[in-house]
Amino acid sequence: MAKRDYYEVLGISRDADEKEIKRAYRKLAMKYHPDRNPDDKDAETKFKEASEAYEILADSSKRAAYDQFGHAGVDGQAGGGFGGGGASFSDIFGDVFGDIFGGGGRGRTTRGADLRYTLELDLEEAVKGKTVKINIPGHKECEACDGSGAEKGSRPETCGTCQGMGQVRMQQGFFTVQQACPTCRGSGQIIKNPCKSCHGQGRVRQEKTLSVKVPPGVDTGDRIRLSGEGEMGVDGGPPGDLYVQVAVREHSIFTRDGRNLYCEVPISIVDATLGGELEVPTLDGRVKLKIPPETQTGKLFRLRNKGVSPVRGGPAGDLLCRVIVETPVNLTKRQKELLEEFQQTLDGNNGTHHAPKKTSWFEGVKNFFDEMKF
């Protein structure tokens, strides 16, 4: 049986934020938790399904993989959520809803936030790949206070509310729930004399330069993950990740559709009529394109393997050239006379032979009006 869409399971939209995801999961967890539905297999299944969906969507990197590749992108990464459905209410409230007082649930450390950066590339760069340097805003440990957040000569003090534990217990009905301390916001410490350089944060802003290796074949919407290059963690927590989102600029000649490239090639009325040969551009250089006689405007010519090689491997696409027969402009009097003479040679008994589409079109129009009886 195919898995349901995780967003559908939680009943949220695909652009839901972290709070909406938590709120939706809390509602389902309270409704279907095994502690409240003993011996109810259907409720247990729904609880596990909701827990699995929450585990993926609450993790930014797993969510990004799921958004791009669906269930195939996260197979094996979902553990069923909170130990496969065996977690207690206290675990759920501590892990998911511990921010009621503005802090984390059980951990004293906080993972750094993920960052996103839009990288604009030319089509040639996206197709061939390259290494680019980007500058992103970030943080580093404050040197003035060595990351403590306290002014030199002072230090953080143990929080009197939680006695340095960073957590307090509160009663909710029949359950005792462990929450982040509202006084110290889960840190276990109080800074009475904050550092003037970092305002008690223990870190200051610093721009950093990173090298991003862009693989060949990327397209608009593709994302490159740089693990550990996001915001620094709080209180020794791990850093977040940086997601580089690719945006390919419009090209003056080519348009892209997956692996294939398209371009328009103008040809003269003479080349279209008599045939000829011309050079067309590709991303690998110029190639010869043979135009057969009696070519009509809009005809597509396919150049095999002159498109884009997929970023995840596989054969290259094709380049499709659509010819546009140009009508001559700015003609001299003599040129117009020659065209009129040429037109006279096409008229007469053999006129339909030289313009079959035109003849069939006029016949179709005539039949249309005859049927409508105008």
Swiss-Prot record:
PROSITE patterns xref list = DNAJ_1 (PS00636), DNAJ_2 (PS50076), ZF_CR (PS51188)
Q: Which residues cross the membrane?
A: none
Q: Where are the CXXCXGXG motif repeats?
A: 142-149, 159-166, 181-188, 195-202
Primary subcellular site in the record, as a coarse category: cytoplasm
Keywords for the protein's UniProt record, in alphabetical order: Chaperone, Cytoplasm, DNA replication, Metal-binding, Repeat, Stress response, Zinc, Zinc-finger
Start and end residues of each CR-type zinc finger?
Answer: 129-207
Top-level taxon of the source organism: Bacteria
Quote one Gene Ontology molecular function term. Answer: heat shock protein binding
Region: Disordered; residue ranges are: 216-238
Using the record's annotation, list all stretches that form the J domain: 5-70
List the record's Gene Ontology CC terms alphabetically: cytoplasm
Give a single Pfam family match: DnaJ
Q: Which GO terms describe its biological process?
A: chaperone cofactor-dependent protein refolding; DNA replication; protein refolding; response to heat
Q: Which cofactor does it need?
A: Zn(2+)
Q: Which residues bind Zn(2+) 1?
A: 142, 145, 195, 198
| Residue positions binding Zn(2+) 2 | 159, 162, 181, 184
Cofactor info, note text: Binds 2 Zn(2+) ions per monomer.
Cysteines engaged in disulfide bonds, as pairs: none
Subcellular location per UniProt equals: Cytoplasm
Per UniProt, subunit arrangement is: Homodimer.
The task this protein performs is described as: Participates actively in the response to hyperosmotic and heat shock by preventing the aggregation of stress-denatured proteins and by disaggregating proteins, also in an autonomous, DnaK-independent fashion. Unfolded proteins bind initially to DnaJ; upon interaction with the DnaJ-bound protein, DnaK hydrolyzes its bound ATP, resulting in the formation of a stable complex. GrpE releases ADP from DnaK; ATP binding to DnaK triggers the release of the substrate protein, thus completing the reaction cycle.
Domain text: The J domain is necessary and sufficient to stimulate DnaK ATPase activity. Zinc center 1 plays an important role in the autonomous, DnaK-independent chaperone activity of DnaJ. Zinc center 2 is essential for interaction with DnaK and for DnaJ activity.
Q: Report the sequence similarity comment from the record.
A: Belongs to the DnaJ family.
List the protein's name: Chaperone protein DnaJ
